[in-house]
């Protein structure tokens, strides 16, 4: 974002429970230009901390939980439910610029509007004759970096029970901290159609080649939307369920379930949903269309425009 906004100095500081005082942060900025702003993205800041910053400098806060009435100049909540959280009804935000909803999802450059893979998906959604959907593409499975419950492994084993699914290509995205990587690699050795991808740097490419994705709640859902990939979404953490449920409620994703509530049921429902979705071309097309309508890849650009307008 610094490259897009030469007039804006973004100081991204991961605060701890012993965070520096605002005065200490600002003192290190004294030699910089005066027409700058600070972008804060931390759960640890307090109302007092933000108020002190706001007195000295344009203060922007990234939020997703609405913990209290933040004394800031601009508030960004790019979640799909951001507009439903009631910020506008809070008198404390009367003079705060609010950037709410998925129009402001700041995706990485590979997912930005106009990128090659994204453009192909957009053409697909418009029915361009020269674009073919990834009907025989792989099934993408993404469950988070650590996947402590081995959801990917459980989903794969459930899928292998069905003739309609066991011959499909499966691409599992795994982080280096996954304690079950050995089990996944063992499955890949047993089934040549299972591929494990660690420390992925080409996520957009993997998504573009996917027929359907099985994904946990999180920012990956927005990336899948930008790529127009039909998705079956599930949750395994408390902060994921609202996001997943909102996607489902708006008809953008199919619901797999909540692992914390009933793990076996979530695994079975997700694979049952995959069987249904793979055989329903009309439903896949509808999910693609709604996904691309939600995320157009210009979120970072819109945030940049809003930030520059404050200078």
Give the location of each predicted region.
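Acidic donor-binding loop of glycosyltransferase active sites
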Residues: 208-219
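C-terminal "capping" alpha-helix adjacent to the active site of nucleotide-linked donor transferases
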Residues: 261-282
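Short acidic alpha-helix that forms the nucleotide-activated donor recognition element
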Residues: 198-210, 225-226
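C-terminal alpha-helical cap of glycosyltransferases
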Residues: 296-311
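Active-site and donor-binding regions of nucleotide-sugar-utilizing enzymes
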Residues: 1-94
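A short, well-ordered alpha-helix in the C-terminal region of glycosyltransferases
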Residues: 283-297
């Amino acid at each position: 974002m610094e490259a897009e906004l030469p007039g804006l100095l973004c100081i991204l500081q991961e605060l701890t429970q012993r965070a520096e005082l605002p005065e200490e942060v600002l003192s290190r900025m004294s030699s910089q230009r005066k027409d700058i702003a600070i972008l804060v993205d931390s759960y640890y800041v307090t109302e007092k901390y933000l108020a002190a910053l706001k007195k000295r400098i344009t203060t922007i806060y990234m939020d997703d939980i609405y913990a209290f009435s933040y004394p800031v100049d601009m508030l960004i909540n790019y979640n799909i439910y951001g507009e439903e959280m009631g910020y506008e009804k809070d008198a404390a935000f009367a003079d705060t610029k609010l950037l709410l909803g998925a129009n402001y999802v700041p995706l990485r450059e590979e997912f930005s509007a106009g990128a090659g893979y994204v453009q192909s998906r957009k053409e697909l959604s418009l029915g361009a004759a020269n674009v073919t959907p990834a009907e025989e593409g792989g099934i993408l499975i993404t469950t988070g970096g650590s996947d402590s419950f081995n959801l990917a492994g459980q989903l794969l084993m459930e899928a292998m029970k069905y003739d309609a699914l066991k011959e499909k290509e499966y691409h599992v995205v795994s982080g280096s901290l996954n304690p079950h990587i050995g089990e996944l690699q063992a499955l890949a050795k047993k089934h040549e159609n299972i591929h494990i991808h660690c420390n992925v740097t080409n996520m957009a490419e993997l998504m573009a080649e996917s027929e359907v994705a099985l994904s946990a709640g999180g920012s990956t859902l927005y990336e899948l939307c930008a790529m127009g990939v039909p998705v079956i979404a599930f949750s395994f953490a408390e902060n994921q369920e609202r996001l997943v449920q909102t996607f489902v409620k708006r008809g953008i994703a199919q619901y797999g379930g909540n692992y914390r509530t009933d793990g076996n049921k979530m695994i079975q429902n997700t694979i049952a949903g995959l069987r249904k979705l793979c055989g329903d071309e009309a439903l896949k097309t509808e999910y693609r269309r709604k996904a691309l309508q939600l995320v157009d890849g210009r979120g970072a650009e819109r945030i940049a425009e809003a930030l520059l307008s404050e200078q």
